[in-house]
């Protein structure tokens, strides 16, 4: 299904001296343009026009559109990492920690669909592996925090099937699949999203973990 995407909104030109606008404003405009026009169609000029500054002013913040796209991903992964670290250190059962992390992941995706698509749906594959190295390291840290309690469950002999690593990958993949469908196919007659998330987590965790 092809989404009908709106053309990015063009802001009035900022008065001279306002070229130091917050990076967040640039990133928000860039998100919309990357989603609407794809990587090839997104240009520094279009992003600058959308926030009402000159291309020269935008280059004061970002050297190219690759850096913008990577920062969008880094910000998203960084937020999820902070959540995972917080949950990982809570004195509750490992299964409860896994559930909280996955709930937070899905809610983040659905509350920030543009950000999520750019960070987790292959948009950055056009960027060289060298440029993506720092982002990949951040992603590995985020996944390590998530998979930690799953390895605890495995070490305690509570997994019905698979290993800690395979269980972690399946849990992530399943939740990613749900939110990706909800984001990219919003016009389907979906059940309420909270119910879908609950059914997904109930089915996955009850199927993988013994009582």
Give the role of each language-model region:
Residues 36-40, 91, 112, 156-157:
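Short coil/turn segments at alpha/beta junctions that flank glycine-rich nucleotide-binding fingerprints
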Residues 72-100, 130-136, 140, 152:
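Amphipathic alpha-helical linker/stalk segments
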Residues 33, 87, 108, 149, ...:
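Short alpha-helical functional segments enriched in proximate histidine and acidic residues
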Residues 26-34, 76, 80, 105:
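Short hydrophobic clusters on alpha-helical segments that form packing/core surfaces
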Residues 1-21, 32, 211:
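N-terminal intrinsically disordered/low-complexity leader segments
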């Amino acid at each position: 299904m092809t989404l009908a995407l709106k053309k990015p909104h063009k802001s009035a030109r900022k008065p001279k001296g306002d070229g130091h606008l917050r990076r967040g404003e640039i990133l928000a405009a860039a998100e919309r343009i990357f989603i609407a026009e794809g990587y090839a169609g997104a240009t520094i000029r279009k992003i600058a026009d959308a926030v009402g500054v000159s291309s020269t002013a935008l280059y004061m913040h970002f050297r190219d559109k690759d850096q913008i796209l990577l920062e969008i991903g880094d910000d998203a992964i960084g937020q999820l990492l902070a959540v995972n670290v917080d949950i990982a250190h809570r004195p509750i059962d490992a299964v409860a920690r896994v559930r909280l992390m996955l709930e937070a992941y899905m809610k983040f995706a659905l509350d920030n669909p543009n950000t999520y698509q750019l960070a987790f749906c292959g948009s950055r594959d056009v960027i060289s592996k060298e440029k993506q190295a720092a982002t990949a390291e951040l992603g590995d840290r985020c996944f390590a925090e998530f998979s930690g309690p799953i390895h605890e469950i495995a070490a305690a002999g509570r997994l019905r099937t698979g290993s800690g690593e395979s269980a972690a990958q399946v849990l992530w993949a399943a939740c990613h699949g749900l939110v990706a469908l909800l984001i990219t196919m919003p016009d389907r007659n979906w059940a309420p999203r909270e119910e879908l998330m609950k059914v997904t987590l109930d089915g996955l965790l009850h199927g993988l973990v013994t009582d």
